[in-house]
Amino acid sequence: MKYVIGIGTNMGNRLENLKNAVYALELAPKTAVIKKSAVYETSPVGYAKQQDFYNCAVLCESAFEPHEMLGICLGAECGLGRVRNFKNGPRVIDMDLLLAEDKIIRTPNLIVPHPHIKERLFVPVSYTHLTLPTKLEV
């Protein structure tokens, strides 16, 4: 199944954090990173008193079902040092399952397409890059 995963960070070495998150996906079993978007700097949403975010999106293919893929993302976040102090607060890494092919999922733990996909300004541009024939490096 193909997935679009949004990745963001606004703590520490933001570019290195993005690279580490992509690498975590590359290391995941039964999962291949197909394409990476460019990196975008965006303002925080919800809680403004924090550093701007670096964001990108990754197109990957995996044998895992959506809830399992969410688990991979959450595990990668934990492994990269994510601590959830408060909603919309600063974070070393954030990995969101934005799309899972044409699936529509509404469960307590997972909503796909991601419920805030329209509010994230980097998502449409990143998605466009992911569907272009050229490879962009993160």
Residue locations for each model-derived region?
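Conserved small/polar residues in nucleotide/adenosyl-binding loops
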Residues: 128-134
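Histidine (H) residue identity feature
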Residues: 67, 114-116, 129
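Catalytic beta-strand/loop module used to bind and position nucleotide/cofactor moieties
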Residues: 5, 72-123
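Short, histidine-centered active-site or binding-site loop motifs used for metal coordination
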Residues: 7, 127
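Acidic active-site catalytic centers that drive phospho-/nucleotidyl reactions
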Residues: 10, 55, 94-96, 131
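Nucleotide and nucleotide-moiety/phosphate-recognizing core
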Residues: 2-5, 11-86, 101-102
